[in-house]
């Protein structure tokens, strides 16, 4: 049984997806620093929405904070794709075993980051949660 088969995903395509995911993740880390330095962390008082909307008026701190959330969502989807495609290739070729396991670890870390980000907003920036969110982002990248 194949998990996903949209196009024939050979090793080169999986490699390109991986590199794109790394680039987007690095951009997310940079944007996370911008969120902190511009004090935009609580520009959206609720989570996962922003003022009750998934697409609020994007200006000022809201643009920065909600943009960070949207980019994080993209990283999540890309990581899910990596898990699916490495699993699909792992079933055909055991050389993908470590890639599959690493992509699973990455997915767990992305989910943890999403939860920590949500807790950070809901509980108004508790130091331990914010610090853990930062530390996990460093470990992830």
Regions found by a protein language model. Give the residues of each.
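Extracytosolic (periplasmic/ER-lumenal) interhelical loops and adjacent juxtamembrane/interface segments
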Residues: 36-66
């Amino acid at each position: 049984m194949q998990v996903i088969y949209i196009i024939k995903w050979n090793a080169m395509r999986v490699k390109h997806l991986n590199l794109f995911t790394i680039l987007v993740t690095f951009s997310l880390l940079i944007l996370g620093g911008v969120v902190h330095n511009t004090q935009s962390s609580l520009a959206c008082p609720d989570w996962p929405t922003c003022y009750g909307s998934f697409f609020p008026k994007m200006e000022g701190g809201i643009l920065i904070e909600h943009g960070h959330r949207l980019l994080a969502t993209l990283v999540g989807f890309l990581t899910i794709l990596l898990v699916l495609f490495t699993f699909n290739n792992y079933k055909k070729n055991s050389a993908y075993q470590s890639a599959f396991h690493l992509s699973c670890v990455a997915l767990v870390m992305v989910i943890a980051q999403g939860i920590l980000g949500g807790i950070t907003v809901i509980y108004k920036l508790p130091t331990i949660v914010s610090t853990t969110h930062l530390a996990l982002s460093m470990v992830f990248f």
